[in-house]
């Protein structure tokens, strides 16, 4: 089914990644898993999730170690996603599990004006006009994403939307032998019965 995103372009709900062995397909999935788990895990640990969450395997943020220069440089993530009529841009830079820089922006789908939600550079955090309130704490653990910190401690619509999007992501990489041994079952009792019945029919 096509996802209709008027006035912006329509989207297909599925994407396929092709490439030769050693071409980076698994690395791309691991990078996405790393980013998602980095954001979601602190929220999950504090029991502040807003959706039913399937806990993803934690992937550590490890730089490319076969190059003297890159082994000491931060790993950078840049992700665009759409939810609730907005397109979000999330940037995260990490080194040795510490946040070097982080930013979250959004704009209406089809719109031109981008609004900064927050910008973080080291210990300096600048809040956008939509959340620039004196009551919001800017003193955060260097190992915690500020997006996660805001999601845990405050009720901010833009942060809630971003949080729900990250929590809804499910990544399964069957290049991981542990993942091949796991089966994901729905909480819906009817679907669960149908699935188990189908497995029994196959012997």
Residue ranges and their predicted role:
Residues 35-47:
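Post-Walker A helix-loop "phosphate-sensing" segment adjacent to the P-loop in P-loop NTPases
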Residues 83-203:
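Electropositive, glycine-dotted interaction segments
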Residues 1-34:
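Pre-Walker A-like glycine/lysine-rich segment at the N-terminus of P-loop NTPase domains
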Residues 9, 70-73, 84:
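A short catalytic or substrate-binding loop motif that flags glycine-/basic-rich loops and adjacent residues
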Residues 31, 79-81:
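Short, hydrophobic/aromatic-enriched beta-strand segments in well-ordered soluble domains
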Residues 13-15, 77, 90:
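Residue-level detector of short, conserved catalytic/binding motifs and their immediate flanks
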Residues 71-79, 100:
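Short, hydrophobic/aromatic-rich segments at coil-to-beta transitions
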Residues 49-70:
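AAA+/P-loop NTPase substrate/partner-engagement loops
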């Amino acid at each position: 089914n096509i996802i209709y995103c008027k006035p912006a372009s329509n989207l297909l709900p599925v994407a396929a990644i092709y490439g030769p062995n050693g071409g980076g397909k698994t690395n791309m999935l691991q990078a996405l898993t790393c980013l998602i788990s980095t954001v979601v895990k602190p929220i999950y640990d504090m029991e502040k999730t807003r959706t039913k969450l399937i806990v993803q395997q934690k992937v550590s943020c490890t730089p490319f170690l076969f190059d003297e220069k890159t082994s000491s440089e931060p790993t950078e993530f840049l992700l665009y996603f759409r939810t609730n009529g907005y397109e979000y841009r999330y940037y995260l830079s990490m080194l040795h599990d510490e946040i070097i820089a982080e930013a979250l922006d959004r704009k209406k789908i089809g719109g031109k004006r981008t609004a900064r939600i927050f910008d973080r550079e080291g210990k300096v955090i600048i809040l956008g006009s939509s959340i620039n309130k004196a009551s919001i704490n800017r003193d955060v653990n260097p190992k915690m994403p500020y997006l996660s910190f805001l999601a845990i401690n405050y009720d901010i619509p833009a942060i809630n939307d971003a949080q729900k999007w990250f929590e809804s992501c499910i990544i399964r990489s069957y290049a991981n032998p542990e993942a091949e041994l796991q089966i994901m079952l729905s909480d819906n009792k009817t679907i669960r019965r149908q699935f188990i019945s189908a497995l029994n029919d196959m012997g």
